[in-house]
Curated annotation (Swiss-Prot):
Keywords (A to Z) from UniProt: Transposable element
Note: The ORFIS open reading frame represents 87% of the sequence of ISM1, a mobile insertion element.
Highest taxon of source: Archaea
Role according to the record: This polypeptide is involved in transposition, and should therefore bind to nucleic acids.
The protein's name in its UniProt record: Insertion element ISM1 uncharacterized 48.3 kDa protein
Length: 401
């Protein structure tokens, strides 16, 4: 008699794990326990909870799981397009990924999307929050993506955030249209884009305390500076320009034919540096050193008068004691101060003229600190960041009389 193999319906039998209390002395309904374990309905915790929004505005599950059988063997079955009315009246188009389970054949898509629920405009609200985050200070795109994942439970690709935040700047950014005062500060800051040295040019309104225009250029030459200042002040009042002591700025101001104030702070800083180096090299100490610094103080007082006329008279009196002036100061006075004395005292006859360039340097310190000067790789990237910083600074520091 031949033996026949009969199917035991293995596919219908599940494994169960007996627990210690199954062997207690108490009377237990074993059939009920086994039936309950075999017919247990699977509970898939954290199933399809984490959403991901890619650079194509497509919502996907981070780790799709079949909601019926719990299988991870999922294939993609195309996308469906949806439109959402935004808070600004415009329509945002996005897609939702569709899936199918390879094990049980169940088809499913994105459900309970917290960003596009009924009568909600969360997608647009998220897009509107990105500028606010960028205004705070430098944040990497991946870090911003992490913020959304932590607080909203959705992971947005860094490329999507870049697409939302980029403003497609060519080479300059300009502030809003205010009634500018005509009293400006100008300065430059070096930075590196993809390892190459560039310069950040800034024209700053001294009265409103806000930047007017900024530009990124490859070379620091008079042509670029002059072109930038003229284009930034076109159809705007232009009374005076305050800069530091860099020689190129004097030539540009003369070509533009505008009143030019040199920074008093940088002048005093230069004098102090020359004295310090001179005394150290020549090992000068004691009374001789005190005499040199006292004489330098007399020179500084010439720039602290009540008017240009008084400043000129004070400077003439100082020069009458020329033989008493230390050698280190004589050389600097002869080559620099005598030729440009009028540029240091313009502010004495006009209270609106800034005597230092400290305001624009403070703006630099707060909007692009040293630690991030080498991070950016493109002009558009750094200009987008600076545009948000300009908006933030203007909101906080503008002074309108």
């Amino acid at each position: 008699m031949t033996k026949q193999n009969k199917s035991a319906l293995n596919s219908n039998i599940d494994f169960i794990q007996l627990k210690l209390y199954d062997f207690f002395d108490e009377k237990i309904d074993q059939e009920k326990i086994i039936s309950k374990r075999l017919n247990k309905t699977p509970n898939f915790e954290n199933t399809n909870h984490k959403l991901f929004l890619d650079e194509n505005n497509t919502f996907k599950y981070d780790n799709p799981i079949c909601p019926v059988c719990g299988s991870h063997k999922i294939i993609k079955k195309g996308t469906i397009k949806k439109n959402k009315q935004n808070t600004n009246g415009k329509t945002t188009e996005f897609k939702e990924q569709q899936y199918q389970c390879k094990k049980c054949g169940k088809k499913f898509g994105i459900y309970n999307n917290p960003l596009i629920g009924e009568n909600k405009q969360f997608l647009q609200e998220i897009m509107d929050k990105i500028p606010g985050i960028m205004k705070i200070g430098y944040q990497s795109l991946r870090k911003i993506s992490k913020y959304f994942e932590i607080f909203l439970g959705i992971r947005i690709s860094h490329q999507t955030i870049k697409n939302w935040s980029d403003k497609n700047h060519e080479e300059s950014i300009s502030n809003e249209k205010f009634e500018y005062s005509g009293y400006y500060l100008y300065d430059e800051q070096f930075l590196r884009l993809n390892g190459t040295r560039h310069y950040r040019l800034t024209l700053f309104d001294a009265i409103l305390n806000i930047p007017v225009t900024e530009r990124i250029v490859r070379r620091r030459i008079p042509k670029n500076t002059k072109k930038f200042i003229l284009e930034s002040t076109e159809n705007k009042p232009f009374i005076c320009l305050t800069t530091d002591l860099f020689p190129m700025y004097r030539n540009v101001a003369d070509e533009i034919e505008v009143k030019h104030q040199l920074c008093i702070f940088h002048l005093f800083q230069t004098i102090n540096h020359k004295l310090k180096v001179y005394c150290r090299r020549n090992k000068i100490n004691g009374k001789q050193r005190d005499h040199i610094y006292e004489n330098a103080q007399e020179l500084k007082n010439c720039f602290r008068q009540n008017s240009k006329k008084e400043a000129i008279e004070q400077f003439k009196q100082y020069l009458q004691k020329y033989t008493a002036i230390p050698v280190v100061l004589k050389d600097f006075i002869r080559k620099h101060i005598i030729n440009h004395f009028h540029r240091y005292v313009e502010y004495l006859d006009d209270e609106n003229i800034e005597k230092t360039s400290n305001k624009v340097e403070n703006y630099y310190r707060q909007t692009n600190p040293e630690k991030i000067k080498k991070i950016y790789k493109t002009k558009n990237g750094i200009l987008t960041f600076l545009d948000y910083q300009m908006q933030n600074w203007t909101e906080k520091h503008i002074k309108i009389k």
